[in-house]
Amino acid sequence: MEILQIAIILIVFVLLCIPIGRYMYKVSEHKKTLLDPVLDKIDGFIYKLSGIQKEEEMNWKQYIFALLMCNAVPAIIGYIILRIQAVGIFNPNHVKGMEQGLTFNTIISFLTNTNLQDYAGETGASYLSQMIVITFFMFFAAATGIAVALAFIRALSGKKKLGNFYVDLVRITTRILLPLSIIVAIFYIGQGVPQTLSANKTVTTIEGKLQNIPLGPVASLEAIKLIGTNGGGFFSANSSHPFENPTPLTNSVQIITLLLLAGSMVVCFGHMIKKKKQAVAIFAAMMVLLLAGAAICFSAEKAGNPALSRIGLSQSMGNLEGKEERFGIAGSSLFTTVTTDTSCGAVNNMHDSLTPIGGAVPLINMMLNVIFGGVGVGFMNMIMYAILTVFLCGLMVGRTPEFLNKKIEGKEIKLVAFAIIVHPFLILMSSALALTTKQGLAGISNPGFHGLTQVLYQFTSSAANNGSGFEGLIDNTMFWNVSAGVVMFLGRYLSIIILLAVASSFAAKRAVPATQGTFKTDNTIFTVTLIVIIVIIGALTFLPAVALGPISEYLTL
């Protein structure tokens, strides 16, 4: 029954990707849709109000400049709001302003689509901050990621201009993110998720004691949290909290929605380059890696804790520590896998309580950072590996490698190599810094191998813009707030800049006709080769660190 539950969720996800991906293609290419009569007027009003010239096209440098400037302004405004949130506007619970280190971490976290939270949502942010800062950035960061991916695909398809960042940002928000979020938020409200501006309720329990029940505009935040692969929760318990994820049905919907746009982006890619088989090959590689991770995580958690088994305690129900009974092993394991496949970072169970092998799965997913990934940017990472795969295969047969009818030359490979190196460099160097400084070691709550995994997970999550964590880490300190913030920032924007440079280099090349000697990239052989290359590079890069963490912990149980 548990396997059937997982299968149904993933089948629904795949089926929904087809129409949503086609719709995203129409939005990106300004094709007609049913919503145009209404949304054209809304978009036009926004263009006039903000002075956007919608006909103006940008090259890759202009696109990046617009992106960076457009990200900088709300970051400054958001920082100010979090610092002064103690004022009485939409703050019925009298939440105090955040201190500077935590504010820096929070702004960078939500700006970069990471949503790493070193604060408790119900006590650390006012309603004003939750709506104006947190929810706004969830839309803004997701729209930015999708816009970059669309510009990336346009360049790969041979267009010299990448579009207009401001126009892309508006259209993605009004035509994709807002409609989906409204539908999902209404569903959540129907399932019992709160949506109110009332203050917290104090109730008398059956034991006769008083308990404070936190409330707030939860449903609206929860919808975009998953749709935009954001992951930050209204409550500190995130999607394990009954007010965020009350039923097995909402849990299934959350899994589907956090995968939906990331998977639909691949379908959109196939339409935009007019090569649907190419999209199928990429999608298949992602699904194989997803299924492998889900199978390993589920098996490890279902087997339970071997240390408890050896002392005679039954493990027939599996490892239920840190999990919600309403979701069970299947719902928790699948959520754990896909939330780190997609760089979402929402959690419906305590990752710190996973078995060593079960906990290694989300860690490795984020280290690879290619399995669907966050909305937009994760897809670009997979294309980066596809380019590298074609290049290596070309070397083996002695031919000039080609991808999408464009020759892959030294410039592209140097940029791709740099982009691949950035991710592990940020993870391993920052982890080494934390493990060799007094401030870093002070945050580790568990000694030995598990403590090392906590540190490794924190920086892997930050570099991958995921945001989930082994919450045993004491991370609300100046050291952890600043170091994680810097890693999140570099992990987001360095990748975007490098990969747009790669795409623009492809756009400048002439298309070459395919010949009998051309390595086909739209078949099973390519999919298998792509998976092997990803696994080999990931193992060569991260295996020593993983061996010192979860693998060593498993061997010592």
UniProtKB/Swiss-Prot annotation:
GO cellular component annotations of the record: plasma membrane
Transmembrane segments: 1-21, 62-82, 132-152, 176-196, 253-273, 279-299, 371-391, 415-435, 482-502, 528-548
Keywords: Cell membrane, Ion transport, Membrane, Potassium, Potassium transport, Transmembrane, Transmembrane helix, Transport
Location within or outside the cell: Cell membrane
Alphabetical list of Pfam families matching this protein: KdpA
Role according to the record: Part of the high-affinity ATP-driven potassium transport (or Kdp) system, which catalyzes the hydrolysis of ATP coupled with the electrogenic transport of potassium into the cytoplasm. This subunit binds the extracellular potassium ions and delivers the ions to the membrane domain of KdpB through an intramembrane tunnel.
Similarity-based family: Belongs to the KdpA family.
Protein name: Potassium-transporting ATPase potassium-binding subunit
Organism listed in the record: Clostridium acetobutylicum (strain ATCC 824 / DSM 792 / JCM 1419 / IAM 19013 / LMG 5710 / NBRC 13948 / NRRL B-527 / VKM B-1787 / 2291 / W)
Name of the encoding gene: kdpA
